[in-house]
């Protein structure tokens, strides 16, 4: 198994409950294939660098994963098929840090609340 970091952007009009359902669907795929979610972070509703479709903002979500390449391909296939996900990127990593990501560190200096950070070791 290999480490992967995946970030996906969900449409701005999707509720937090629906975002949780999307992440739970991905978690089920990962666990059913003997993978592990090492870290997950909700980065909040952020302004996009450029408009994507009718979206000027998006909900950003990060997953740190320990999975096989086949599971990565299945996750990316599901992300492509999900109409609520407007962009995603998954890269292979050497390791997954247990520290909060730099984006969350920057958010803590702002007035934006952090809704979900989970680290599994």
Swiss-Prot record:
It comes from Rickettsia conorii (strain ATCC VR-613 / Malish 7). Belongs to the bacterial ribosomal protein bS6 family. It comes from the Bacteria. GO terms for molecular function: small ribosomal subunit rRNA binding; structural constituent of ribosome. Gene3D superfamilies: 3.30.70.60. This is Small ribosomal subunit protein bS6. Binds together with bS18 to 16S ribosomal RNA. InterPro entries: Ribosomal_bS6, Ribosomal_bS6_sf, Ribosomal_S6_plastid/chlpt, Transl_elong_EF1B/ribsomal_bS6. PANTHER family: MITOCHONDRIAL 28S RIBOSOMAL PROTEIN S6, SMALL RIBOSOMAL SUBUNIT PROTEIN BS6M. NCBIfam families: S6. Keywords: Ribonucleoprotein, Ribosomal protein, RNA-binding, rRNA-binding. GO terms for biological process: translation. Pfam families: Ribosomal_S6 (PF01250). GO terms for cellular component: cytoplasm; ribonucleoprotein complex; ribosome. Disulfide bonds: none annotated.
């Amino acid at each position: 198994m290999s480490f992967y970091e995946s970030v996906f952007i969900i449409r701005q009009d999707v509720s937090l409950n629906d975002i949780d359902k999307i992440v739970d669907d991905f978690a089920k795929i990962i666990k059913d294939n003997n993978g592990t979610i090492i870290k997950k972070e909700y980065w909040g509703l952020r302004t996009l660098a450029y408009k994507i479709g009718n979206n000027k903002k998006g909900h950003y979500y990060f997953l740190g994963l320990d999975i096989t390449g086949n599971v990565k391909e299945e996750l990316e296939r599901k992300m492509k098929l999900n109409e609520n996900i407007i962009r995603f990127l998954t890269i292979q990593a050497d390791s997954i840090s247990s520290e909060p990501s730099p984006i969350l560190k920057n958010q803590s200096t702002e007035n934006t609340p952090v809704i979900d950070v989970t680290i599994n070791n």
